[in-house]
Amino acid sequence: WQVSLTAMRAEQDAQEARRRTAQAQALRRSPSGAVVIEHANLFDSERMTMRPGTTVIFAQQRVVAVGPDGSLPIPAGAERIDAAGRALLPGLWDLHTHPDLDSGPLFLAAGVTSVRDMAAEPDKPALLRVFDTSEALGPRVVFAFSIASS
């Protein structure tokens, strides 16, 4: 088996990459137009309160307007989502992480959309760039510093 180890690892890595890419392509969405979330119970982080009956409009992956239900003009052709009073929170940050390819979907499932990697190995930034593409699901990663290679 030792003679085959390198080939086996390469095949395992290739299979895992294909699985991650298939998962990302099946679950990732990039809306072409505006997205409107209506009737949300919005968490206001500046006032530390919930704002019931709130509409939030997103365009090009950014929040472009927030207001009470019925107070904002809805862009033509926008995808509309009825939050039905459910809570709407901003994406959460985890400021002390050591992410890897397998942890990406777990962060997102927990509402964590951005992380800071506290001690990246020299090859880790390139490895985790797949989160910015459709190759793997994961949060935005900010690197605090990189461990110097020897």
Regions found by a protein language model. Give the residues of each.
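Extracellular/periplasmic ectodomains of large secreted or surface enzymes and adhesion receptors
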Residues: 1-39, 73
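Envelope-exposed proteins and targeting segments
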Residues: 33, 38, 52-54, 111, ...
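Solvent-exposed hydroxyl-ligand-binding patches built from regularly spaced Ser/Thr
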Residues: 23, 78-80, 93
